[in-house]
Amino acid sequence: MKKADAIWTKDFIMVLLVNLFVFVFFYTFLTVLPIYTLQELGGTESQGGLLISLFLLSAIITRPFSGAIVERFGKKRMAIVSMALFALSSFLYMPIHNFSLLLGLRFFQGIWFSILTTVTGAIAADIIPAKRRGEGLGYFAMSMNLAMAIGPFLGLNLMRVVSFPVFFTAFALFMVAGLLVSFLIKVPQSKDSGTTVFRFAFSDMFEKGALKIATVGLFISFCYSTVTSYLSVFAKSVDLSDISGYFFVCFAVTMMIARPFTGKLFDKVGPGIVIYPSILIFSVGLCMLSFTHSGLMLLLSGAVIGLGYGSIVPCMQTLAIQKSPAHRSGFATATFFTFFDSGIAVGSYVFGLFVASAGFSAIYLTAGLFVLIALLLYTWSQKKPAEAEGKVSIAE
């Protein structure tokens, strides 16, 4: 293979590591902050959910503009600036003991998380050879899947052996390490033109062809928010905190194992053969959580949810791109994840309002049954498919 066609270059590895650092932090705090709110701040489950929702809300608000910001000021510069502000603000978790101030910190970090995750994806796309871009971006996406397992596992286990100040210091230093790595990335100069003009037209923020499938994605993520925001607190309530971190390991393992097979089915047979069963499997996994009182059941639930949810999301992201013009694939992806993040943000808050009175079993059972409506929404989204100018594959 020619050196020019290589994927695993120094710069690709560096940007993949930065992305891994960011998402490990994201998934760790997604899991730990609800517990911190209850134990250290004397807050409620709904307040813990609000910390998650506000972070995602600020990311959602910023995301439609983050692409223009990155192009206007340059990818390398924005990678360093956004990583620096995210890392340095992480040290503020230690002195803050006021819930309102903590909300402000989460909102601030959400802004830079949005820009940072936008710029790492853009840099990765620039670095990967054009003829191997699908394969390379598939590897890049796996860093997020790996973080989904590492973050909660590391956070929940570390939280049990150190105090919260030590915990927050460790992860702030972890992000500083990510900042140092970002300095080592070399971005192709021609890609940073700095000539982008800010505009506020709908078409400069969203892709119309992706809106229907993005709506289905929003519904899926709304139900999935019960896992991201409340799994750790639920595990504590049923005396399973010691193994709750392994839930996410099982989740990530089945998700990564399933992806190559579901990708081939998607390409050869069509999206329905993957999405319909995956929604049903996801529903079963959530319902299993509602009846969980043993470690084995918790781990099995994680594996089942990972199999279902892990198959749905990449298929829907691919559909969002396929239903859009080829030159609008970036906007299609941004549209899908804007809706997806919105579902998690709203779900974290809404389910948090009811968990204190209804209990965790009730919200997981409700989410498990509620997600079945996505079967009808998906059918609706496919009734009048838009003609795409290009096709992409998730079988890479």
UniProtKB/Swiss-Prot annotation:
Q: Which GO terms describe its molecular function?
A: transmembrane transporter activity
Provide the alphabetized UniProt keywords. Answer: Cell membrane, Membrane, Transmembrane, Transmembrane helix, Transport
Q: Which GO terms describe its cellular component?
A: plasma membrane
InterPro entries given in the database record: MFS, MFS_dom, MFS_Exporter, MFS_trans_sf
Where it sits in the cell: the answer is:
Cell membrane
Q: What family does the database annotate? A: Belongs to the major facilitator superfamily.
Can you name this protein?
Uncharacterized MFS-type transporter YwoG
Origin organism lineage: Bacteria, Bacillati, Bacillota, Bacilli, Bacillales
Q: Which gene encodes it?
A: ywoG
